Amino acid sequence: MTQANGPLRIGIGGPVGSGKTTLTEKLCKALRDEFSIAVVTNDIYTREDAMMLARLQALPEDRIVGVETGGCPHTAIREDASINLQAIAELNRKFPDLDIIFIESGGDNLAATFSPDLADLTLYVISVCQGEEIPRKGGPAITRSDFLIINKSDLAPYVNVNLDVMESDAARMRGKRPFGFTDLSRGKGLREVIDFIVEHGGLRVGTATSTAA
């Protein structure tokens, strides 16, 4: 189906290894039967994430565009988003029925935010393996993202992380902004992310999204 105001653009940020590409893959596979989807990935010097999504068959290869930012990944999603906006324009031209475009940033830190000209909603992914103190360190990515995803929760016992502490700190730092724990490799917690996207993105829902884990 086609959204009345053009495709919903969802920015996905997070440090290297947090699970951004896994999140993008899982979201594409859960939503692709219901919505027309495309992806733009950002890497500094390669198109590794785009190639990985193609190998994982998240979407047909022509719906996945990799851009090489050639420098600080923050700039390409915030101060000068032109390379991403050009990729989005090309995808819109090729697929005029698009409902959702995911924009996956390159590896970034807690100061990363998406330009409002680029993303309508922002998801930020951190990993428990980075340490239980990450939520309370704050930064715009933690405090301002529309949905904070604390991934790899299954590994908490092995990296000496207390999930209750992370939950308390995230709630304190984010106020009323939502967050959730996930184990994206197994699809745990994905349903909550999808529900947030559908509700806050104004998507029209049929039956396909009910199959997500």
Curated annotation (Swiss-Prot):
The keyword Transmembrane helix does not apply. GO terms for cellular component: cytoplasm. It is found in: Cytoplasm. One of its GO terms (molecular function) is GTPase activity. GO terms for biological process: urea catabolic process. SMART domains: AAA. It holds the Pfam family cobW. GTP binds at G14, P15, V16, G17, S18, G19, K20, T21. InterPro entries: AAA+_ATPase, CobW/HypB/UreG_nucleotide-bd, P-loop_NTPase, UreG. Keywords: Chaperone, Cytoplasm, GTP-binding, Nickel insertion, Nucleotide-binding. Facilitates the functional incorporation of the urease nickel metallocenter. This process requires GTP hydrolysis, probably effectuated by UreG. Homodimer. UreD, UreF and UreG form a complex that acts as a GTP-hydrolysis-dependent molecular chaperone, activating the urease apoprotein by helping to assemble the nickel containing metallocenter of UreC. The UreE protein probably delivers the nickel. PANTHER family: UREASE ACCESSORY PROTEIN G. Belongs to the SIMIBI class G3E GTPase family. UreG subfamily. This is Urease accessory protein UreG. It comes from Mesorhizobium japonicum (strain LMG 29417 / CECT 9101 / MAFF 303099).
